[in-house]
Amino acid sequence: MTTEKRQILVTAALPYANGPIHLGHMVEHIQADIWVRFQRLKGNDCLFICGEDAHGTAIMITAQKQGLPPEALVAKMHKEHARDLGGFLIEYDNFYTTHSPENRELAELIYTRLKDKGDIFAKTISQAYDPVKEIFLPDRFIRGTCPRCGAKDQYGDVCEVCGATYSPTELIDPVSALSGAKPIEKNSEHFFFSLNRYTQLLKKWIDAGHLQPQVANKLKEWFSEDLKPWDISRDAPYFGFEIPHAANKYFYVWLDAPIGYMASLKNLSKQRPSVNFDAYWKEGSQTELYHFVGKDIVYFHALFWPAMLSGAGFRLPTAIYVHGYLTVNGQKMSKSRGTFITAHHYLDHLSPEYLRYYYAAKLSAQVEDIDLNLDDFIQRVNADLIGKYVNLASRCAGFITKNFGGKLANELPELDLYESFLQTEQTITDYYESLNYSKAVRVIMSLADRANQYIDAKKPWALAKEINQEAQVQAVCTQGLNLFKILTTYLKPILPVTAKKVEQFLNCDELNFANLKTPLLDHSVNPFEPLMQRLLPETAAQLTHE
């Protein structure tokens, strides 16, 4: 019986083009990449897209400070971000940019459709203005006290403590982040999206299970009051797309940023004719669409975005998967403590697969923060990957190469043990599918323990010294390497480079779930090369000091 291939589109949140990617960003990109690789390993068609979030006053000001046009800054950061994501083995089909003709075209299309439906209206508002810099202040360039929970030093549009969104004029004791001056009020006409028109649609969509229960419950709190209209415009000077037929008005970065997912696929469809844009985005599409995002941008993705898509006649996401923040050694990342670790700095010192594994061992389907404890990181990598997983192969491979010319036995001596490893496939794939990677890793490592216990019990090193035990040595090591093959298939979404090395060592086809059950018997393997290096205690110091 053949199961029909699923057609899946996966996105990760777009990194912002005014700073480097750090290990906090990597939680999401690794989480999404593991899921995509798992789907492909299962034989599903899975496209994976992302891109540079390129617009906003922050980009404009950063570019000015660096003496660059905004376009040049975006191009530079796009190159750096693509390098770092690639370094962590994040396998995007397209890593594009929101500053693109496709994104402009789609933003204008969605805006025009919403306007034609009567969902857009103009209103004169009082806005924060920096009298020193002579610029309207974007939300992120105003700091003050949250009007909802009273947390100090919060952004002008969203509170990182309670998650409230608000307008900058509601902030208590605001100051300009550009000059330190107290902003003055200045009137300006802005365009608003009538989000409240979509209240029932959003309630129904949230109730239908498209979000984790924690996220859905949090969002339902916002419906206790009417949803407020969303300000989708900004005044010049601004780096972004001009609003059609509105002089000196630009789309707010959060309007065109999620449309960047669509633009990235549209651009990919031009490069790859087999990719049909409408098949993934048209209303009523039978394909699957998943967004991986952090908990700080849930409001934009789970309220504004579905409403915009619905109003403009596009499909809604199948699910939005939300993750928590990263802490390092139990605390928020900090430059002064040396725990603000950029992706590039990490890659200068260590294999990306160590961090991919450590994150996988911590990630669940819950919206929980995860902690990168550097001592635990070293211990976990050494104990699990080196001590259990790689050790299994290195204990068996030498005998096969040296004593049997690389030839495996023609049968397995312990078929029941082999079958028991195969019987965990459904459990492990269910854990991957549901984003419970930590549970998958736990099962896989318990299998690695059992495989090593088998080798410990059979003692091929002792058998090799006995007379007439050659066949038994070959059989035991063949069993061990076939168990190692199963473990590698299970770990392949997390450790893609190591899996490739194992395929070369085992001299076999690409490992996947379709060929999982087939053992390698009467088969020649290549000489074993070391797969990973043990981490030294000074690793933590290398990562936390430039």
UniProtKB/Swiss-Prot annotation:
A UniProt-annotated Pfam family: tRNA-synt_1g
Subunit description: Monomer.
Motif 'HIGH' region in this chain: 15-25
Gene3D superfamilies recorded: HUPs, Isoleucyl-tRNA Synthetase, Domain 1, Methionyl-tRNA synthetase, Zn-domain
Stretch forming the signal peptide: none
Name the UniProt record assigns to this protein: Methionine--tRNA ligase
Sequence motif: 'KMSKS' region, positions: 332-336
Main location: cytoplasm
Binding locations of Zn(2+): C146, C149, C159, C162
Catalysed conversion reaction: tRNA(Met) + L-methionine + ATP = L-methionyl-tRNA(Met) + AMP + diphosphate
Keywords tagged on the record: Aminoacyl-tRNA synthetase, ATP-binding, Cytoplasm, Ligase, Metal-binding, Nucleotide-binding, Protein biosynthesis, Zinc
GO BP annotation list: methionyl-tRNA aminoacylation
Cofactor section: Zn(2+)
Task performed by this protein: Is required not only for elongation of protein synthesis but also for the initiation of all mRNA translation through initiator tRNA(fMet) aminoacylation.
Protein family membership: Belongs to the class-I aminoacyl-tRNA synthetase family. MetG type 1 subfamily.
One function term, GO molecular function aspect: methionine-tRNA ligase activity
Cofactor binding notes: Binds 1 zinc ion per subunit.
InterPro entries in alphabetical order: aa-tRNA-synth_I_CS, Anticodon_Met, Met-tRNA_ligase_1, Met-tRNA_synth, Methionyl/Leucyl_tRNA_Synth, MetRS_core, MetRS_Zn, Rossmann-like_a/b/a_fold
The enzyme's E.C. designation: 6.1.1.10
HAMAP family: Met_tRNA_synth_type1
Compartments where located: Cytoplasm
Sequence positions that bind ATP: K335
PANTHER family named in the record: METHIONINE--TRNA LIGASE, METHIONINE--TRNA LIGASE, CYTOPLASMIC
Keyword ATP-binding: yes
